[in-house]
Amino acid sequence: ELRSPVNPHVAQAAEIYRGQIAPQAVKTAQPLGELLARIAQAKDFDSACGLLGYRAQPEFPCYFNVKVSGEVVAVNTRSRSGKLTLKLTDAPLSSVEVQIGPVYRGTALRDSYRGLSYGDFNDQALFGDFARAINQASIDELAGSPPKVGDHITVYGVFSSWQAPAEPLLITPVRIQP
């Protein structure tokens, strides 16, 4: 009988998130205003992605690690895919949305990480399990005291795009601080 061995990366997802993914995203985060200006100055979006972001394969969107600051103007917790709206103080976009859970949409945290790729997993299901575990680690880490309307915060996180970013921009956070 064939059995798929347990993939160690899935079992260690929270540890990988805390020790590698979140620190990598914070260390390489670019202020959104500067990032958007540099993307606009690039020859084309693919060139900008190569210089400023990360794309594991050409058929994937580009992932950017970003830092944004502003005032929380809305918090939506009615949906399981909760989000807050951040009115920006330092970027050409007027606002961004930041995922707050309890469920994150997408795989931005997994796909922006340069340390592992699909080839490190036994199959598509395990790669998906790893993405869910990474998202849950972020949600758990940020669950302490969620921001409220009127709070001024700084968010470090990841967003993906196929072209020059525009509103609404959805950021998956790795750190939220006052």
Listing of model-derived features with the role each one plays in the protein:
Residues 1-178:
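OB-fold and OB-like single-stranded nucleic-acid-recognition modules
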